[in-house]
Amino acid sequence: MKSAMQYLGEANEMVERLDVEAAVAKHGNDDVVIIDVRDGKAIEETGTIAGALRIPRGFIEFAADETTDFHNPAMQKDKEILVVCAAGGMAALTGRTLKEMGYARVYNIGGFGAWKEAGGPTEA
């Protein structure tokens, strides 16, 4: 049986970590989709990245799967996917899931706080 830390370690090996400055530079690119996987309460308290999809970690499989009624049409396998959470752990796990679902260009951009500190655009 694997521990949570083992799963996280495997996810971190599978999903490249993109530094926040590089992520901010990609913001607004038509080829890039940013997903905030924190829950609604966390986003309500801190805001999120401007234009980010708000898809909670527990719903990502449905939003990413084009065969479900819950598919988010912005989720396309030819897009570059940047995933953010509070500190990077949920983003890594989400990235692993997306890669296993066939999304090739998936990056963990860490936590929203780092994005905000780097001057990345935000919204309520």
Residues covered by each model-derived region:
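Active-site flanking residues adjacent to catalytic metal/cofactor-binding acidic residues
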Residues: 35
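Rhodanese-like catalytic fold shared by cysteine-dependent sulfurtransferases
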Residues: 1-32, 40-80, 89-124
